[in-house]
């Protein structure tokens, strides 16, 4: 178990170093293009999260409204039935 953990520690330390050596071999234009690509992917992921949050919020509102409707239907004091019209 200790050996596995030590490999994980070594791998986690070497992982950023591999990016440094790769980044050093890239031109400024290539690095900029890679950063722009990452930014675009991040924006798309953020948009997906926003859309999912809107869906979740809509589902929650529907559940709350349907629960409120069910509660109103079971309410013993129904205003529509007991109210008298004003002459």
UniProtKB/Swiss-Prot annotation:
Signal peptide start-end: 1-23
Protein's cellular compartments: Cell outer membrane
Keyword Hydrolase carried by entry: no
Pfam assignment, any one: Sugarporin_N
Annotated GO CC locations: cell outer membrane; pore complex
Predominant place of localization: membrane
Topology class, membrane: Multi-pass membrane protein
GO molecular function terms listed in the Swiss-Prot or TrEMBL record: porin activity
Keywords associated with the record: Cell outer membrane, Ion transport, Membrane, Porin, Signal, Transmembrane, Transmembrane beta strand, Transport
GO biological process: monoatomic ion transport
Domain of life: Bacteria
Known role: May be a sugar porin with a broad carbohydrate specificity.
Family indicated by similarity: Belongs to the porin LamB (TC 1.B.3) family.
Name of the molecule in the record: Putative outer membrane protein ArbH
